Amino acid sequence: MSTPLQGIKVLDFTGVQSGPSCTQMLAWFGADVIKIERPGVGDVTRHQLRDIPDIDALYFTMLNSNKRSIELNTKTAEGKEVMEKLIREADILVENFHPGAIDHMGFTWEHIQEINPRLIFGSIKGFDECSPYVNVKAYENVAQAAGGAASTTGFWDGPPLVSAAALGDSNTGMHLLIGLLAALLHREKTGRGQRVTMSMQDAVLNLCRVKLRDQQRLDKLGYLEEYPQYPNGTFGDAVPRGGNAGGGGQPGWILKCKGWETDPNAYIYFTIQEQNWENTCKAIGKPDWITDPAYSTAHARQPHIFDIFAEIEKYTVTIDKHEAVAYLTQFDIPCAPVLSMKEISLDPSLRQSGSVVEVEQPLRGKYLTVGCPMKFSAFTPDIKAAPLLGEHTAAVLQELGYSDDEIAAMKQNHAI
């Protein structure tokens, strides 16, 4: 089966989550991704949050499937020579080291262009080069704080909150992936590679665009009618935290379901659509609300939206969350159960679709990983296990033309 990126070679100089999530997707699309790791150590996530002693952690295995791993010491002359040969044959190089790290290895963008003018150089940093925070070390929650997510997440009477979703890390990797694929297409037209940079702050901000929309509306109006603070609360000069509100034109909230007293996830998310208000009233046994002026329009409902949700919750709290969703769906009401990670890991539909995949790695054995979220009609990504540290060092060096004796000498000289 042919794959979209078959024949594309990627040098993966990334670690932790933002870079590996990008290069893993390239590997799923068929690229030959060579993960370059420090001899004897490897990606730091191999050792972080281990569940089995002395075995690659799930943190690593779930972000590095389908790749090849080589151990290479680029501080040695032999290591630099290998690196130059790899660059000469590669299509893409991706890195997410601290600013200047690749330059200090002797591989500036200018030098890389001299070696291989067709190479596409992908780079992830916490902040853009023109940012006052350019030298700040960035991780997931740092990016969420600086990108506008934290200030707009949480409840109005509490502190800013960070999201459990990897808005700063994996999201940045997905944004860079888009840029790299665009650069590959551009190379088909120009014959030359280019540098693609992605800041974690920018990636978070791109997902917070509706909050930038709301800031401009707030500046003009002094209020935001879809937020729970309207009309009885107060608005400051910045977009407030809205709790579980929908954030768009459709009010929504988390509602209790049967068993909530002991099950922390016995809830559903319920959305009220203006165009579906009549069905909503019928579903919750409030047909009089359809024509009642206090409820018949979104503008009329907003002042007592929490009273409305409390009334709806009187129904949802009597039934299981899955039963609630099944019932409400008959009335075309947008809703979903709050699914725990335990439920997601056991969901047969996610296994069937390939969204959750079981793979097997030597030493670790079988484990679950997230599969490719995109579903293609012409091919299905074959999700394979993450590589062991240095598993493919000899094979990659042989492909570059090194003999067994030369490889043995490099090992003795601590170049690999």
UniProtKB/Swiss-Prot annotation:
GO biological process: oxalate catabolic process
Binding residues for substrate: G248, G249, Q250
Function: Involved in the catabolism of oxalate and in the adapatation to low pH via the induction of the oxalate-dependent acid tolerance response (ATR). Catalyzes the transfer of the CoA moiety from formyl-CoA to oxalate.
Sequence similarity: Belongs to the CoA-transferase III family. Frc subfamily.
Pathway the protein takes part in: Metabolic intermediate degradation; oxalate degradation; CO(2) and formate from oxalate: step 1/2
Subunit structure, interactors included: Homodimer.
A Gene Ontology molecular function term of the record: formyl-CoA transferase activity
UniProt KW keywords: Transferase
UniProt keyword Transferase, yes or no: yes
One Pfam assignment: CoA_transf_3
Active site: D169
Residues at which CoA binds: 17-18, 38, 72-75, 96-98, 104, 137-140, 273-275
Alphabetized InterPro entries for the sequence: CoA-transferase_III_domain (IPR050483), CoA-Trfase_fam_III (IPR003673), CoA-Trfase_III_dom3_sf (IPR044855), CoA-Trfase_III_dom_1_sf (IPR023606), Formyl_CoA_transfer (IPR017659)
Catalyzed reactions per annotation: formyl-CoA + oxalate = oxalyl-CoA + formate
EC id: 2.8.3.16
Enzyme class: transferase
Tree of life domain: Bacteria
Record's protein name: Formyl-CoA:oxalate CoA-transferase
Keyword hit for Cell cycle: no
Signal peptide residue numbers: none
Upper taxonomic lineage: Bacteria, Pseudomonadati, Pseudomonadota, Gammaproteobacteria, Enterobacterales
Gene3D superfamilies in UniProt: Crotonobetainyl-coa:carnitine coa-transferase, domain 1, formyl-coa transferase, domain 3
